[in-house]
Amino acid sequence: MSKRPADIIISTPGSKVRRRLNFDSPYSSRAAVPTVRVTKRQSWTNRPINRKPRWYRMYRSPDVPKGCEGPCKVQSFESRHDVVHIGKVMCISDVTRGIGLTHRVGKRFCVKSIYILGKIWMDENIKTKNHTNSVMFFLVRDRRPVDKPQDFGEVFNMFDNEPSTATVKNMHRDRYQVLRKWHATVTGGQYASKEQALVRRFFRVNNYVVYNQQEAGKYENHTENALMLYMACTHASNPVYATLKIRIYFYDSVSN
């Protein structure tokens, strides 16, 4: 903000006089430009970072992850799943090598954030039954991917085969890490029916993915840190359908 504004308003109880300070300016006849009034609250909120507490400097997230470079790229996965009691799995870090804004440049990139939106719903025959069904979602990092994704029952240990009690097996704790976990619930019946539930989640993960020399974006081409989405419903006999659109925002590594 200028130390010497163009106009000064001199206020008296009886009158208001506007004086101009640029008398010799060739633009002295132009209309006065209104200046934006800045309140104390705005100036305090937008104060420089060195005047803020250390917490703002320690825990702020950079725009570009460490060791990466822009631009920010996007890859979308759109699918419909038949979620059953024994679980379902999909890989959400499948990115093909290329030169576009949906491709990876080399073997390494960082998935900064994930946006998951869609719904879970029941068909006409199932929603008439009196029951409640919840879908458990697990966003998992696979640190050492091999061959093909493991099933839900191979990764998680459950009590009485109940997905709501699922935890990573002790033998896989070094390989699989649950980054996020959430659920959505639908209810069937004649009266208190909720036949569909919306799913909308945004997560910041900063997951560094490494591929091999292959160009195709497949699970078997991962060598480190594949992102997996595991799903399972809590009702043993009534399945649930999930229509999801998953977008990952990633940056290429500078070491490619």
Swiss-Prot record:
Q: A Pfam family name for this chain?
A: Gemini_coat
Question: Gene3D superfamilies per the record?
Answer: 2.60.120.20
**Full protein name:** Capsid protein
Q: Where is the protein localized?
A: Virion; Host nucleus
Positions occupied by motif Bipartite nuclear localization signal: 3-20, 200-247
Per the annotation, the residue ranges of the short sequence motif Nuclear localization signal are 40-54
UniProt superkingdom: Viruses
Cite the entry's keywords alphabetically.
Capsid protein, DNA-binding, Host nucleus, Host-virus interaction, Metal-binding, T=1 icosahedral capsid protein, Viral penetration into host nucleus, Virion, Virus entry into host cell, Zinc, Zinc-finger
Entry keyword annotation includes Acetylation:
no
Q: Which source organism?
A: Indian cassava mosaic virus (ICMV)
Q: Name one GO biological process term.
A: viral penetration into host nucleus
What's this protein's family per the entry?
Belongs to the geminiviridae capsid protein family.
Share what the entry says about its subunit structure, partners included: Homomultimer. Binds to single-stranded and double-stranded viral DNA. Interacts (via nuclear localization signals) with host importin alpha-1a.
Q: Which positions are tagged coiled coil?
A: none
- This protein's GO CC annotations: host cell; host cell nucleus; T=1 icosahedral viral capsid
User: Where on this chain is Nuclear export signal (motif)?
Assistant: 101-122
Q: Which GO terms describe its molecular function?
A: DNA binding; structural molecule activity; zinc ion binding
Q: What does this protein do?
A: Encapsidates the viral DNA into characteristic twinned ('geminate') particles. Binds the genomic viral ssDNA and shuttles it into and out of the cell nucleus. The CP of bipartite geminiviruses is not required for cell-to-cell or systemic movement.
The zinc fingers classed as unnamed run over 68-85
